[in-house]
Amino acid sequence: DSTGGGETPSRDVVFTYRPTSAAVAEAETCATAIVGGLARRAYRRPVSVGDLDQLLSFYREGAAEAGFEAGIEKALRALLASPEFLFRVERDPDGVATGTAYRITDLELASRLSFFLWSSLPDDELLDVAAADRLREPAVLETQVRRMLADPRAETLTTRFASQWLHLPNLDAMQPDSRQFPDFDDNLRQGFRRETQLLFKSILDEGRSVTDLLTADYTFVNERVAKHYGVPGI
């Protein structure tokens, strides 16, 4: 509901501009700024005139029916249903033969980085660098990767990527012999999963070798896992 619920953090993110009068032109200027900014994030690239015209046509329909906020809501519905938002599109460059390797654009690289490291959209800083065709520069790329890894959103690299790579969801299907492991329960299962995630995170945060996943002489345990391993004093 675009008009209910009062001010909330999510509404504040969307409604960064508001008309101060009933003038249609002022409302459309605000709508253009709002929709254009959100489309740039959602499409993960600069927004073309055609992109904006299409989205504003939905805004005008909604605004004519129920006012400014309803118009923004209708434009956002169209934005979120767009293939440009739902799919990560990488177009072959003109003149490249089928099957030939080619360098992806900086904007495509920005999307790959953000979805890999954050499982989310690129932020404004990453998009700005990519739009300026500077992201492929080694020093700039390293700076952006380090910045992204220091961001709390990089936690998803531990919880999602590590889980997928190491098939941690398969733990849910494991049912050890209850006669040999009578104390095995879901708390222990969750402890094993978190142990692996924290080990992966420590390797990433401390710049250790990936082989530490196999050779590390340390780990992370809670009381339940420590008891299972026979580790005293925890």
Predicted regions mapped to residue ranges:
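Low-complexity, glycine/serine/threonine/alanine-rich intrinsically disordered linker
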Residues: 1-234
